[in-house]
Amino acid sequence: MNDTMMGTSLPYAERKRQGLMGRMPHKEESLSQQRRRIYRLVSAMQSPFDQHLLLRQLQEDNSVLFYDLVRHHLPELLPIIYTPVVGEACQRHSDLYLRSHGLYLSWHDRDELDDIFASVEQEVDVIVISDGERVLGLGDLGIGGMGICIGKLALYSAAGGINPARTLPLCVDVGTNNPALLEDDSYLGWQAPRIDGETYYHFMDKVVAAIRRRWPEVVLQFEDFAGKHAANLLARYRDELCMFNDDIQGTAAVASACVLAGLQQAGSTLADTPVLIVGAGSAGCGIAAMLARLAGSPERVQLFDQDGLVCLDRAN
């Protein structure tokens, strides 16, 4: 059976040309008619998670309709296709897996990376990559991190206008330290403790180098990497590709913009304002670094975590 991404909006003559006669109902719907019909179906779902599953299926079956629907109902549907609802989808990723979307790169594939990327026919403008070690506030979800990559790219296309056909979600499977996943027969990722240290970075070197060979102009976004790796990866590859880490730099950019806007309204400046950031994880440190640069005086920005004020003479 032939397939189409237009569904019932496909004109009669085109159905005939593609050999689709009898494969769909008679009526030719406009895109707006399709959108209203699907929106009623989404609205009738009993839970946000059921809505998420329906929208993911729509994204696979008819991406034109999916993005048209999301753009027309953006404030309502963004929390459904991304946070907070995507968290449950990431936790249940293996149970829900039906078809491939994006690429999974296992450590065992380390010598096949060029062939894997060559199998992707389209040109790619944006890649969101995750190793699933720190997914949202849920911890190590292994290949469940793929859900975050898919959801983030859907946001970029729906709200940012990036062509979805030129995006690629990419999950790096280096094992998992989650005991539940290691013992779960349904888990589809590599069931072994995570590789780390030089072995981990050697694999990431190979991944980034292969990406650069295939798409040298691509934007590479790191998503939900553990704090011990996040900043190191940025520093390691900053001269290789155009890249950023959303948890560090994206959050910092938005938070800094809010601080600057608030100070402007208050008639003050960042250089004259002491800043205390509660939380010294990837996001907190990223915000602190950006505000310190903007202020021109790092001593104006302080970090406070569960052990107190972060300072050089602190034991931990």
What are the residue ranges of the model-derived segments?
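N-terminal ligand-binding/catalytic initiation module
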Residues: M1-C242
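Glycine-rich phosphate/diphosphate-binding loop of Rossmann-like nucleotide-binding domains
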Residues: E240, N245-N316
